[in-house]
Amino acid sequence: MATLEELDAQTLPGDDELDQEILNLSTQELQTRAKLLDNEIRIFRSELQRLSHENNVMLEKIKDNKEKIKNNRQLPYLVANVVEVMDMNEIEDKENSESTTQGGNVNLDNTAVGKAAVVKTSSRQTVFLPMVGLVDPDKLKPNDLVGVNKDSYLILDTLPSEFDSRVKAMEVDEKPTETYSDVGGLDKQIEELVEAIVLPMKRADKFKDMGIRAPKGALMYGPPGTGKTLLARACAAQTNATFLKLAAPQLVQMYIGEGAKLVRDAFALAKEKAPTIIFIDELDAIGTKRFDSEKSGDREVQRTMLELLNQLDGFSSDDRVKVLAATNRVDVLDPALLRSGRLDRKIEFPLPSEDSRAQILQIHSRKMTTDDDINWQELARSTDEFNGAQLKAVTVEAGMIALRNGQSSVKHEDFVEGISEVQARKSKSVSFYA
């Protein structure tokens, strides 16, 4: 074995980095230190083996627990509603402080940690869960729908919100295909509707920058057949929004509270699927002026309207949920519906003017094979007090007459005869306003 002098004479890599204390040690002392290092290496190897064994045991436990979780999560689940979520730490701290004050003993093994929950199952059982289950308790809220194990009642998964099937049926699945070019003679009404409904949805940043609060909704009123529903569908198509079509008579139910529940579910569904346009047709069915009545049916209609008022006040205009209502009896509506802050924009749909009637006739006949010499202005002058729906009926009648006569195209005389047909069916005694 080389002596210290020989080691000093040799040029070894890292000599400059050696500690001066090590260089001053004797051979015996270096051998002793080497043995100590060997012992430490053996200890570290033993510790490494122990940790490796513990890691393998832990992996086995994790695998076993995953298998148990998989077995427990097998469908079907029992459906339950979360009643309350409680923080057990606060409860235990309070009980422990009271027990300490009274000189009692505290059993640390039984102290609960974390959050607990109270759930009510579909089998009408109310169960307290000190351990919530596989769902993060911080994400649970009262009234949430969850799936629980039918034996242990542990929460296994969260379920989507439950809505009334009648409300789900109100959602228009197919996107409306109407455009503003399909609506004739309503340029002013289109502009007002775009300002109230479309712009707040598509350019919300502009309203925010200017500090303007967008209207919550709009009320369209006017005689039947003037294009209220058509314009609402065109508005929904332009905004790419979910379209919920509520017919107000559907909200009048036989049982007490059913109509109000439908209104609540409709607005909850609209918030979940935002941006959404809620279109309430024939609003006068539930929005009539309130009056004293002994009949339960009248009181139920009034309760439904009060729930509608509450929902109009309850959601912010920033929620990308807009309400469009249509009626042909604006004179019978309750003043509470018409006040500012609910249906802010009131849009009147009058009977079309002469130029508007000519435009509507051209829109409805643009896909028909017609002669070039049709005088649309003359036809418009002949259809005084016709609404949009009756003008469409004129074009249909003209097409049927041309088909009946074996013609290859629709002539001006066919439109004149179609006007006569519709005029004959038009009752002069019908009044749309009381």
From Swiss-Prot:
PROSITE patterns: AAA (PS00674). This is 26S proteasome regulatory subunit 6A. ATP binds at residues 222-229. N-acetylated by NAT1. InterPro entries: 26S_Proteasome_ATPase, AAA+_ATPase, AAA_lid_3, ATPase_AAA_core, ATPase_AAA_CS, NA-bd_OB-fold, P-loop_NTPase, Prot_ATP_ID_OB_2nd. The keyword Nucleus applies. It is found in: Cytoplasm; Nucleus. The lineage of its organism: Eukaryota, Fungi, Dikarya, Ascomycota, Saccharomycotina.
